[in-house]
A protein has these predicted regions:
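N-terminal helical hairpins
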Residues: 1-10, 95
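Short linear motifs at secondary-structure transitions and domain/linker junctions
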Residues: 6, 15, 35-36
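Short alpha-helical hairpin
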Residues: 12-26
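N-terminal core-binding DNA-recognition domain of tyrosine recombinases/integrases
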Residues: 26-39, 46-124
């Protein structure tokens, strides 16, 4: 498996330049939710953004391997239950879907990420 250090670095000055754009992207995504859903979605997105910050990764420059490493981190380092990993990844994927809708990205880096084991669609999707 590829490690984070094998991925090309994202220059830290790039992070500063995109901070306003990232804030706008986060606000646009969270605006789609209200009440408890917004609160819990914000918490899950905050976890992903913190992971990105720990790895000096601009979330708007993330690629598919970064998201797969995020999943592995949740599974192997944090030892989250499969349902938690699935939910938190779904929030990150939704964030990127909104970025594509809003024209901030051409395509979502989450689009072809292998879903974690134990993932299944929500009951209402069946």
């Amino acid at each position: 498996m590829m490690t984070f250090s094998e991925l090309p670095p994202v220059p830290s000055d790039h992070l500063v330049l995109l901070s306003d754009q990232l804030r706008l992207a986060v606000a646009a995504y969270l605006a789609r939710f209200k009440g408890a859903s917004r609160y819990h979605t914000e918490s899950d997105l905050r976890c992903y953004l913190a992971w990105c910050a720990e790895h000096d990764l601009d979330p708007l420059a993330a690629r598919r391997p970064h998201l797969e490493l995020y999943i592995r981190w949740m599974q192997e380092v944090r030892r989250f239950k499969p349902s938690t990993v699935s939910r938190r990844f779904s929030v990150a994927a939704g964030f990127y879907r909104t970025c594509v809708i809003d024209g901030l990205m051409e395509h979502s880096p989450a689009e072809h990420v292998r879903r974690p084991a134990g993932w299944r669609p929500a009951a209402w999707c069946k």
